[in-house]
Structure formats: structure tokens, C-alpha cells
Amino acid sequence: MRYVVFDTETPNRCNDRISQIGFCVVEDGIMGPERCFLVNPECSFDEFNIMLTGIRPELCRCEPDFAELWRRELEEVFSEGVLVAHNAPFDMAVLAKCLRAYGLRWKHIASYIDTVRLARRAFPTLSNHRLDTLAYRLGLELEHHDAGSDAAACAHILLACVERGAAPEDFLRGYDMRAMRTLRLANI
């Protein structure tokens, strides 16, 4: 199976724009290179998000907006695999809101897997299943809240869960990109 493991960072609490997006492809158990892009969100930044991510407005000012980046770098890759993210409902909602904000049409239903749920199966004795906790447990370097680093860590977590016997297909969900909600398996 082909997985597109991704992470988003947002400039403010609205979570309808992206200031950074990172991804890597995992196919047949092999992780491809991490890709990461700053994005001009064309909106204001909240101080909280700046402190969390380190991404300031001036870093994004000359970067492409989401629509340009989507067409140039993301749409083809994201269309050819199951999306995977850590706390995926958040990232799926951000992606759906961004597509809507820019008037971009994509799939109505996108398949996804949440590695938080997968990790709970593979690592049941951990006190929590946050990205930084799992990265530490697996000995991964993590620049938390850098979308590329978070996506790469998520990909390693996906592979570690598979090694421990967790089946990603058991955690497959659908996300209605128009209604912005997770669907039960029977509705996919």
C-alpha cells in the first residue's frame, strides 16, 4: 500500500490556512525522502502559533500560496495514496479548509489513517501517544512543530507500528472533504 504521511502547521487559531506543510511517501514498507514547504497563508499570524512553530510572517511572505503549491507539488502526490497523519482529524480538517478557502476541488472522500489510534494498538503501555513521546520511545530526532520533521517522525511511527503487528488497514477511515468530518467505514 502507498501512504502519504503529512503534517501541517497553521498561522493562527482559525486553522483554515497553512504556513508549512511536510510529507513523505511510504510505499511497500520503504520511506521516501521528506519534503517540506513554507506557504504564504495570506492571513494574519497569532503570536501563539509563532511561538509554537517558530514560523514568522516574514518567512512566508515570498513563498507560494497554498493554491500554487497544491497544483505544483501536492495534488498529484496526495491523490495517489492513503493519507496518514498524527492526530489526523486535525490535519485532514486543515487540508479541507484550505482547499475550500482557495476554491480548489479535490476528492470528495479521502482515505486516511491516524497514527495516534494505530500507536495505541502497537504501544498499549505508553502513558500517552503524543508525537514527541513516540519519537522519544523510538529514538527519533524530532524538531516538533516543524512539518517536515513531524511528517518524517509520523512515517517512522507508522513503520514501527507495522513491525509490532498493528495493521494500518484496520484503522482506515474516510474524510468527507466537503462536510469536513470523518466517516464510518460503512460510509466510505
What are these regions (language model features)?
Residues 1-110, 124-145:
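Conserved non-catalytic scaffold segment of RNase H-like nuclease domains
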Residues 62, 85, 120, 179-183, ...:
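Short, surface-exposed loop/turn motifs that are enriched in glycine and acidic residues
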Residues 68, 117, 151-153:
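Short secondary-structure boundary/hinge segments and terminal tails
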Residues 95, 118, 154-158:
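Buried hydrophobic packing segments
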Residues 111-114, 172-173:
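Beta-strand segments within the central parallel beta-sheet cores of soluble alpha/beta enzyme folds
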Residues 113-124:
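Short, flexible loop segments at boundaries between secondary-structure elements
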Residues 146-160:
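Acidic, divalent-metal-coordinating active-site segment for phosphoryl/phosphodiester hydrolysis
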Residues 157-188:
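Acidic two-metal-ion nuclease catalytic site recognized across multiple nuclease folds
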